[in-house]
Regions:
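Ferredoxin-type iron-sulfur electron-transfer modules and their immediate structural context
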Residues: 1-185, 214, 218-244
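Strongly charged, low-complexity linkers/loops
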Residues: 181, 191-193, 197-199
Length: 244
């Protein structure tokens, strides 16, 4: 077993012990094995299970080197945890990614890597098991497990900055400014704005992408949607001249 602890237990053995002793598997789930493994476990124990929607880790920060200019230089330990304990970060945004890669080091499955151009972690969806190790490793809580979505399609706010709009935008050009325009166009009431930042409830989101088009800063991201081809311009029919 992976012994990643994504199930909430210390390891695979502890999970197995709990599953055997439990009256059902409602509170026991292995994110690495997923529904297929849980079906096999349930069959052995004589239980029934409800399938769960696949999850994936999402990095809720778009503070790239371009969007979020550095204001100072950090020369200490290359650890996000240590860095966060010393100061707010080397940019004007105290909420964003610190860029040291604690999440990458925490991932046992090689699903995370640091992008040298953006300075942000990138999730490989084909390798992510939604074990949650990266979520626990991030001292800024910018990584979240979200519903993977149909055909991998999902919409989320890539920002956690709780400062007022003017301050947040000054620190990062891609920050959510809490204007609420996204919430106003959402017919499914999936978006709320609290503490100056918007959040999309993936259990309510219908993937209409109206909020994406409405966001003035580009803080809302849409992932894995098919690229629509532009409609061809209508061809004007030439009128035949009547020479009489």
């Amino acid at each position: 077993g992976a012994n990643c602890g994504g199930c909430g237990f210390a390891g695979c053995r502890a999970f197995a012990d709990a599953a055997v002793k439990a009256p059902n598997l409602d509170n026991n789930y292995c994110p690495v094995g997923g529904n297929e493994v849980m079906k096999k476990v349930a069959a052995i124990l004589g239980y029934e299970i409800k399938e769960k929607a696949p999850m994936v880790a999402v990095v809720r920060c778009n503070g790239t080197c371009e969007n979020r200019p550095r204001t100072n230089i950090y020369g200490g330990s290359s650890s996000c945890k240590v860095k966060a304990s010393l100061y707010a970060g080397d940019t004007a945004c105290p909420y964003g990614c610190l860029g040291c890669g604690d999440c990458v080091n925490a991932c046992q499955f090689g699903a995370l890597s640091m992008d040298e151009t953006t300075g942000l972690p990138v999730v490989d969806e084909t390798k992510c098991t939604a074990c949650g190790a990266c979520v626990k490793a991030c001292p800024k809580s910018i990584i979240e497990l979200r519903n993977k979505g149909p055909r991998g399609m999902r919409v989320y706010v890539s920002c956690v900055n709780k400062d007022k709009g003017v301050v947040a935008r000054k620190a990062c050009s891609a920050a959510c400014i809490g204007c609420g325009k996204c919430a106003k166009v959402c017919a499914s009431e999936a978006i709320t704005v609290e503490n100056n930042v918007a959040y999309i409830d993936f259990t309510k989101c219908r993937l209409c992408k109206k909020c994406v088009a409405e966001c003035p800063t580009g803080a809302i991201h849409d992932v894995n949607f098919p690229v629509l081809k532009p409609k061809a311009a209508p061809v004007e029919e030439k009128k035949e001249e009547n020479n009489g």
